Amino acid sequence: MNILITGSSGFIASYVIEKLDQSNNIFGFDLKKTKITQLIFDIRKDLDRSKLPKKIDLIINLAAVHREPGHKPNEYFDTNILGAENITSFAEQVNCKQIIFTSSISPYGIEDKLKIEDTIPCPNTPYGSSKLAAEKIHIAWQNRDIKKRVLTIVRPGVVFGKGEGGNMSRLVKLIHKNFFFYM
């Protein structure tokens, strides 16, 4: 199976790639080169098909601008929405029938109620809005051939673990420095 993974140098991708059957042909795309990333590429641009096989069986779209706060609002939209448009367009060009898209819990917005799959999204940040728009782009791709295309949207909450450098790691460092925090 030929698998294209965007955001291949990221935290989640490193774990996904480790768990994939190594008999697959894995093609990693990212902005920075790592042992996992073979192709340096910006998903805000059209994908260069010349460096890939003619057939891609699965796209795992993990590329995103995600730290919040930390980016200008337009950066979330530029990467997350343009990236979704370019990935789904590429999927159509190579006749890929399956995409896994990693969104976020952020499209639900900040509310104290339990979130379930049927909870109506109400994002209140540029990041959450950009992820919801990217979900809709992926859904539109699937709907253009719903009988043959498979789309899985994953909305993780806080992602952390060994090697993660985000919010949980910062929180743990602050706790070790005896900083008070309130949630």
Ranges and model annotations:
Residues 31-46:
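Rossmann-fold cofactor-recognition segment
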Residues 43-82, 90, 108:
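NAD(P)H-binding glycine-rich loop region in Rossmannoid oxidoreductase-like domains
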Residues 86-126, 149-152:
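Conserved Rossmann-fold NAD(P)-dependent oxidoreductase catalytic core, especially the SDR/UDP-sugar
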Residues 75-86, 121, 125, 129-132:
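Glycine-rich NAD(P)-binding loop of the Rossmann-fold in SDR/ketoreductase-type enzymes
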Residues 125-152:
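Active-site Tyr-X1-5-Lys
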Residues 173-183:
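A conserved pocket-lining segment of Rossmann-fold NAD(P)-dependent short-chain dehydrogenase/reductase
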Residues 132, 147, 160-170:
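Glycine/proline-rich active-site loop of Rossmann-fold NAD(P)-dependent oxidoreductases
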Residues 3-22:
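N-terminal Rossmann NAD(P)H-binding glycine-rich loop of SDR-like oxidoreductase domains
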